[in-house]
Amino acid sequence: MVQKYYESDADPRTLEDKTIAVIGYGSQGRGQALNLRDSGCRVVIGLRPGGSWQKASEDGFEVYSVAEAVKRADVIQILLPDENQAAVYRAEISPNIRENACLMFSHGFNIHYGQIVPPPTVDVVMVAPKGPGHMVRRTYEEGKGVPALIAVHQDATGQARAIALAYARGIGATRAVVFETTFAEETETDLFGEQAVLCGGITSLIKAGFETLVDAGYAPEMAYLEVLHETKLIVDLIYEGGFTKMRDSISNTAQYGDLTRGPRVIGPETYMAMQEILEEIQNGKFAKEWMLENMVNRPVFNALTRADEEHLIEQVGAEIRGFMPQFRK
């Protein structure tokens, strides 16, 4: 069973005399930094010029270059995009990190695939909230928290796990629950979930359903409403209470169709494709492909993104959402 931690397992005094540098001030960076500060931690922000510098300053933080923030910090939380982390680490973090400092991540990609190799004199940990930054912040302000994962890759000081737990408490995660994992497990399951189910799987399934109905002569608007618009209704029910709550909330006709037709759509061929995708994640093929894609300015990424942006389902969706007050700006 997975090890679970709660408020009583995390000692906030572990961070009492430490300065935390949050590198990056996007959604996660801002949410985590604000929560840490409200929990009594000393936080500085490390950024490259421009971008979020002004926003972080307006939020009342001391903002420095990445290199300067790292020099001042005992804990360095890297919250930059995966594809940017290695270059920033080599240029600005590695030359300035203190001995016995703690290097922290919210995703294990760069450590797991060897793009960042820290010295043996520092702790290397992960604290990964299972929710976007704005939710991390909102739930904290409500007195609750978003669950998180922690992992210890390297324990140079003997305090790595204690630091990770104290940080998780600082962002509010121990108010919910914190699960212990490994960098390998977090990275591989996270990538698989994104590719096969949450992002790649769902969008491909929706497009296939939309195209099937449109090709059969049904109105694109009807196809959109049936295979995309109503997705949120079903997913929300599953999120709240699993498959059981969803099936308790739909008609018997819908449930019978779900149970008898669903496995024909997601059958043995899909399972085999998922196994292949998982193997490419495990053996590093996907990571290598993504790193090479970034080295040549993302031609495949950009072409596929444009193609989906121009798909009929996006045009129809924009029109239908225009009729709905909740989506009007």
Curated annotation (Swiss-Prot):
Domain of life: Archaea
Pfam families per the UniProt record, alphabetical: KARI_C (PF01450), KARI_N (PF07991)
Chain positions recorded as Mg(2+) 2 binding sites: D190, E226, E230
Domain KARI C-terminal knotted: 182-327
Cofactor(s) the protein requires to work: Mg(2+)
Residues bound to Mg(2+) 1: D190, E194
Active-site residues per Swiss-Prot or TrEMBL entry: H107
Protein's UniProt name: Ketol-acid reductoisomerase (NADP(+))
